[in-house]
A protein has these predicted regions:
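Glycine-rich, basic loop-to-helix element that forms the pyrophosphate-binding segment
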Residues: 66-83, 100
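Short aromatic/hydrophobic "clamp" motif used to bind/position activated sugar donors
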Residues: 88
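Short, acidic, metal-binding catalytic loop of nucleotide-sugar glycosyltransferases
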Residues: 22-31
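A conserved acidic beta->alpha catalytic loop
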Residues: 23, 38-49, 95
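Acidic helix N-cap motif at the loop->helix transition within catalytic regions
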Residues: 18, 43-52, 100
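Short beta-strand/loop segment that forms part of the nucleotide-sugar
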Residues: 31-41, 61-65
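Conserved donor NDP-sugar-binding/catalytic core segment of glycosyltransferases
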Residues: 100-149
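Cell-envelope/extracellular polymer assembly enzymes that use nucleotide-activated donors
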Residues: 2-5, 33, 210
Length: 272
């Protein structure tokens, strides 16, 4: 595998995006590009993102569309359409990664598999502290996170420990649950086979689960990324979930349609 494309979704939180990008800039593995996928932010976030385009140690591109509510799947499709890598890593702009994040995902990548990683949630109070002090969590030793866990500033600890696991990474090949696009690795060719995210999922909810279900229907299997590629997820208030029930109903209808693979309104509309 050569170039990896890291697609960072963001919306109106420049302070979080700064922390996310800074953690990507110190990666041990430099053979990747960053695509900032902006879901309609205002000028402040836009200027922050554009500023980093000139400061990044790796290739960094920025794509933005009009704010018409939560359309993360749409902006991710647009980002994939312009990316140059053969492997995709989806993360959110309110996530902080460790210095070996790219390297470990590269080690886990295997043809015919997608790789969901795990996340460690920060408390609301500690998130505020991290942002105000601009803490470089990616540079902290494991002892620091043990202390955070004891103080209940993070919700779990064991995700930070690397375990080889071996064949245990393959024991649930068709599991779609808890595979989220805040930390998900997919071969670009597999993403294109299923036509990416289905933009019929409007508003918050289940567009990532739908993607994974269609990957499984297409014969792409799950390789577990837990205990290898954790991310730190900053606390934020919940998104508007007014469309959640509609999206969930659509997801359940598709779950048992094993021949439903290709998104009805997907990435193909942005590719010549």
């Amino acid at each position: 595998m050569n170039l990896i494309s890291v697609i960072v979704t963001t919306y109106n939180w420049p302070a979080a995006l700064t922390l996310c990008l800074e953690s990507l800039f110190v990666q041990q593995d430099k053979n990747f590009e960053i695509i900032i996928a902006d879901d309609g932010s205002s000028e402040n976030n836009l200027e922050t993102a554009k500023g980093y385009c000139t400061d990044s140690p790796v290739s960094l591109s920025y794509i933005h569309h009009e704010d018409k509510g939560f359309r993360a799947g749409t902006i991710r499709n647009k980002a994939v359409a312009i990316c140059k890598g053969e492997y995709l890593l989806f993360i959110d702009g309110d996530c902080i990664v460790l210095p070996d994040f790219i390297a470990k995902h590269r080690q886990l990548a295997l043809r015919g598999f997608f790789v969901p990683g795990n996340r460690v949630l920060l408390s609301q109070e500690y998130t505020q502290e991290v942002i105000e002090k601009r803490l470089a969590l990616y540079a902290k030793p494991i002892g620091y996170f043990i202390l955070l866990w004891l103080q209940k500033k993070i919700n779990r600890l064991f995700g930070f420990f690397y375990l080889p696991l071996g064949l245990l990474r393959y024991v649930q090949p068709n599991k779609w649950q808890k595979a989220m696009t805040c930390n998900l690795g997919i071969w670009k060719s597999d993403f294109l086979i299923v036509n990416g995210f289905d933009e019929l999922f409007e508003g918050w909810g289940y567009e990532d689960s739908d993607l994974v279900i269609r990957l499984v229907h297409a014969g792409i299997k799950r390789k577990e990324g837990r205990f290898a590629v954790p991310i730190l997820h900053l606390w934020h208030s919940q998104n508007d979930k007014s469309n959640q029930d509609i999206n969930y109903q659509r997801l359940m209808e598709r779950l048992n349609k094993l021949d439903f693979i290709i998104a009805k309104k997907g990435v193909s509309q942005y590719i010549d």
